[in-house]
Amino acid sequence: MAASSACLLGNGLSVYTTKQRFQKLGLDRTSKVTVVKASLDEKKHEGRRGFFKLLLGNAAAGVGLLASGNANADEQGQGVSSSRMSYSRFLEYLDKGRVEKVDLYENGTIAIVEAVSPELGNRIQRVRVQLPGLSQELLQKLRAKNIDFAAHNAQEDQGSPILNLIGNLAFPVILIGGLFLLSRRSSGGMGGPGGPGFPLQIGQSKAKFQMEPNTGVTFDDVAGVDEAKQDFMEVVEFLKKPERFTAVGARIPKGVLLVGPPGTGKTLLAKAIAGEAGVPFFSISGSEFVEMFVGVGASRVRDLFKKAKENAPCIVFVDEIDAVGRQRGTGIGGGNDEREQTLNQLLTEMDGFEGNTGVIVVAATNRADILDSALLRPGRFDRQVSVDVPDVKGRTDILKVHSGNKKFESGVSLEVIAMRTPGFSGADLANLLNEAAILAGRRGKTAISSKEIDDSIDRIVAGMEGTVMTDGKSKSLVAYHEVGHAICGTLTPGHDAVQKVTLIPRGQARGLTWFIPSDDPTLISKQQLFARIVGGLGGRAAEEVIFGESEVTTGAVSDLQQITGLAKQMVTTFGMSEIGPWSLMDSSEQSDVIMRMMARNSMSEKLANDIDTAVKTLSDKAYEIALSQIRNNREAMDKIVEILLEKETMSGDEFRAILSEFTEIPPENRVASSTSTSTPTPASV
């Protein structure tokens, strides 16, 4: 009897016949079906075969099953049908003598039974029976019926060694390949910034290169920093016409360091020089040099300057250089600190043995105090340009630049806005006009009015406007608190003038008193500083005098923080106390956390006690003056509070007019009515 075989991998069944004839398909010749052996032990099968071999086995099994389903059992036309049979039906067939042969697998738990099926016209049916176990009773019954039965061991398919090797390696190769593709995609290898050579390109510079920079910014767009702009215009002129300078022996500056607080236009100046110079321009952030891999930062510095030298003359702009140029030798990370290696390479490239002729490095930072001294020396950064907050003229010029695309009502004056915004940076002024435009659009206006400008200034300085308080003790307390600030400030010689008093909450403050700061905030006298302490304590003094010492509230917490810091500065920084003209800044005053940890406090215990005593003396003296002014002007305070509770906002002119009816304002604190349109500095509760 010829045979063909198929394998059922799922249930461990092997079907063996001798030959197949595809008569129903109209085929005249016989064909043999490839024999596929399968292990009946699933755990061993999964452990020995790989993913690729499993797919091949399943495909072959499917072909075998299709072939065997249409085959005849033998040449006499006796068919074989494959199916399952329950154990109870198997016992019934056994009792009736219909069982011809039994093959036992899996330690007697699976039986392949050849039985005569009446449903198939007494043809032999080959079925699979799940046995509860190989019992002695079943064996005795098989012997009694003289049935041919045999037990078989599980057969292992050793297969081809090459296929087994491929199967074993398929999953690890697919896993590693998938991880590699994911790393390339996340690092830019699939079209991102990393490039197709990742990770080989990890040491290459990430600087953005522009052969013909088109930043959309020129020197005409930069205002309020005339000194810095002049320095950059000289650099641009040197790049365009170097012969004018080399004829008299001048050399081009190797580096320009921009130093200033945030928002003053350092990056804007870099964009302007890129748009004006007409030479290749490289731009990169200091944080892009340092990675988690050792040596990457130094490698990127080398690659950056290599590209720059190939395109010289050119400009390299490093934004936030303090990320890589921090002072060395702090002991943090030791001598192998990655940042120090990167900085060492940067120092070498800027002014080392080889030099970098034709490459101008422009860097920006707002933390020049923590930069390494070797980085700041001439030859590396020949010029240090200070970009501070603009003065009145600078603010006016900046407002003209940012107001070009905005519509204003006829009563709006940019000069007045500039006067009202001392201490505002260029970014603050741009944000101010943008907020005013948003408010105008929200209110359905076609042009920006002074009302939107006022509200925008209040919003930027003090925060969002809150819900107005309802009448009651809390509102009355806030009113007395704010009027206390205003009265003590107005009656103390040297204090800033009151701009307005309001009970409209903004941010965390439930009420605000706005003052007009001095024209030059960089030069402040001892009298002015002490007057600010008195004015700051006026709110707490008003609460104590009006409501009693036991009714003072936490509303003065921010005032106390400000006046304590100001008094400490007068003693330790400005030398304005009985201790003498000493600068006594301790380690806690250091701006950098590492320097703060490394700094040694050389102050003696007695000197520290003297400082605390001097600070307390200043505060106590100021508080006594504030209490005296509140007690002596109780009638004026009650009148002003009554009007303020009704109107909720009072201008500085109106406040001074009412106060002058009850007491005399010091001559130096008297202001003209027009000044009330100047800038606010809030004192809040």
Swiss-Prot record:
Catalytic-site annotation from UniProt: E482
Domain of life: Eukaryota
Gene Ontology CC: chloroplast; chloroplast envelope; chloroplast thylakoid; chloroplast thylakoid membrane; extracellular region; thylakoid
Topology class, membrane: Single-pass membrane protein
PROSITE patterns, per database record: AAA
NCBIfam families per UniProt: FtsH_fam
Domain writeup: The conserved lumenal (CL) domain (74-154) is present only in some FtsH homologs from organisms performing oxygenic photosynthesis.
Similarity annotation: In the N-terminal section; belongs to the AAA ATPase family. In the C-terminal section; belongs to the peptidase M41 family.
Protein name (record): ATP-dependent zinc metalloprotease FTSH 8, chloroplastic
Classification lineage: Eukaryota, Viridiplantae, Streptophyta, Embryophyta, Tracheophyta
Gene field: FTSH8
